[in-house]
Amino acid sequence: VNAQLQQLKSLVLDARGAVLDNAFAETEGSEYGAHHLTIDGLSVHFRVARTTPKKVGQFVTFWKRATGDQIEPFDVRDDFDRLIVVTWTPKSYGYFEFPKHALSEHGVLTVGTTEGKRGFRVYPEWDEPNNRSGVAAQTWQLNYFSDLSDQI
């Protein structure tokens, strides 16, 4: 279990009495701390977002290996319930807990013939997006965001 997942466990999951089971590192996405686990019986994918030098927000990948060398976005039919994305800076720390339906509604997951995304930007409340798509993304994403900056 990586350090960010361990910190989330101690700050959030333990505090709410949640049971974390079956955590294992995913072979794909290790540079984003990719893990799969269950929390209170829900199937959860976990990622750590990364700061990029030239754009506001943080980037996270969320894809699966298809066949051979091909990768593809997760599909609404895939068996999972949540995606948790930790985001942090030297002064701030928080996480997004996206339910599957929100990822589907906002084009992250493949639905039918509409292909989802292999990665996307997250915009915690301390970021100020400087374009319309960033503002729109932050607007829906903040519904699933918890700021823990005062606890670190």
Regions found by a protein language model. Name each.
Residues 1-23:
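Acidic-basic catalytic patches of nuclease active cores, encompassing PD-(D/E)XK
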Residues 20-78:
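Short, well-structured hydrophobic secondary-structure segments
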Residues 32-34, 79-83, 92-93, 117-119:
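Short, surface-exposed beta-edge/turn micro-motifs
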Residues 40, 85-92, 125-127:
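Short, flexible beta-strand-to-coil junctions
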Residues 44, 94-96:
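Short beta-strand segments
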Residues 72-79, 85-89, 111-113:
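Short, charge-rich binding segments
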Residues 104-151:
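Helix-rich interaction surfaces within compact, conserved domain-sized segments
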